[in-house]
């Protein structure tokens, strides 16, 4: 697989160089062949920023503010494909190869990135690895009572990738992105610093609203008939949880034992809701409800932002708007 990756990348780079030799005026912005001669004006002055997922993309936009026109921002996962099943296209690799700043999560789902970075054309490119930024705050994946075990054994430690679902983490990560942008574009560093500070205040305010909702809630446990990517969020506010699968699970069918256990926990805790994440398939949650004594629990959905699309962005979706919607759902779940 790795040989195929390198062969593809080499072919793409060669094609770009040949195109540049034939007609330098037609080289696309961001191409690795667009370096100017000593007497030629630079092909572009925009900062090229590539992000993998929506939260990173939206944070970059917020930090740039009214300077967004000075940058070319790409969100690789913009068509609804889940983070855990994404595979980069040839065009994605070219964009990453020549960008000035690359922001990615850095978990198991980003296993393709290492080879891409080694082959990148822009050796001066800055890279922000979210898990590295957070350091010891990153949590190991955990299997709680009743959670279905993975069929595939993992010898190495696995870390929970879903760090963006903590508002506290978001504030730290925004600071790291702001610092990188200030280095890339020192003429506008004061603007980026001020924008990051203002956005951080919004994150802190929403964080306080979450804490207030949890403190006022009747229940302190969430139960997901689904994967569970909200570990960082529940840990921030001292909530407990049960779930069918871990956050990065590839499983989609819950066993009879898993469903029975979760239904029993709903009854024991008198929980009013069974939770799911975004997506159309809520079959496991529905089956759990049907196996409870009352069979009348509501099914509520929280958005983990793993499938946010370019169309969602065009429609005005932001990180803060989705986290605010998640707060509304959380309030209902906690009673």
Language-model regions, residue ranges each:
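Bacterial Sec-type N-terminal signal peptides, specifically the leucine/valine-rich hydrophobic h-region
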Residues: 14-18
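Extracytoplasmic metal-acquisition and chelation regions
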Residues: 21-335
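Positively charged n-region of N-terminal signal peptides that target proteins for export
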Residues: 1-8
């Amino acid at each position: 697989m790795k040989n195929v990756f390198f062969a593809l990348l080499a072919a793409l780079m060669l094609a770009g160089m040949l195109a540049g030799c034939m007609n330098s005026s037609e080289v696309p912005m961001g191409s690795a062949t667009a370096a100017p001669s000593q007497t030629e004006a630079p092909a572009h002055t925009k900062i090229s920023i590539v992000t993998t997922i929506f939260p990173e993309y939206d944070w970059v936009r917020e930090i740039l503010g009214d300077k967004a026109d000075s940058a070319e921002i790409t969100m690789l996962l913009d068509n609804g494909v889940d983070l855990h099943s994404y595979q980069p296209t040839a065009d994605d690799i070219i964009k990453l190869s020549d960008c000035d700043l690359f922001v990615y999560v850095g978990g198991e789902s980003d296993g393709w990135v290492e080879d891409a970075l080694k082959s990148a054309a822009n050796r001066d490119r800055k890279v922000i690895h979210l898990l590295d930024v957070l350091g010891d705050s990153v949590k190991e994946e955990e299997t709680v009572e009743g959670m279905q075990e993975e069929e595939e054994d993992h010898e190495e430690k696995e870390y929970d990738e879903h760090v963006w679902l903590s508002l506290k983490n978001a504030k730290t990560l925004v600071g790291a992105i702001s610092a990188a942008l200030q280095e890339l574009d020192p003429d506008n560093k004061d603007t980026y610093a001020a924008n990051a500070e203002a956005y951080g205040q919004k994150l802190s305010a929403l964080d306080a609203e979450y804490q207030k909702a949890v403190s006022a809630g009747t229940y302190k446990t969430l139960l997901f008939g689904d994967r569970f990517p909200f570990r960082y969020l529940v840990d921030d506010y001292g909530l407990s949880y049960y779930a069918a699968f871990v956050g990065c699970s590839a499983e989609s069918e819950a066993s009879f034992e898993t469903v029975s256990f979760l239904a029993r926990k709903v009854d024991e805790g008198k929980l009013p809701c069974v939770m799911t994440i975004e997506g159309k398939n809520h079959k496991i949650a529905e089956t759990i409800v049907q196996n409870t004594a009352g069979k009348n629990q509501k099914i509520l959905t929280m958005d983990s932002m793993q499938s946010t699309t370019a169309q969602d962005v065009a429609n005005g979706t932001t990180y803060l708007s989705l986290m605010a919607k998640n707060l509304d759902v959380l309030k209902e779940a906690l009673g």
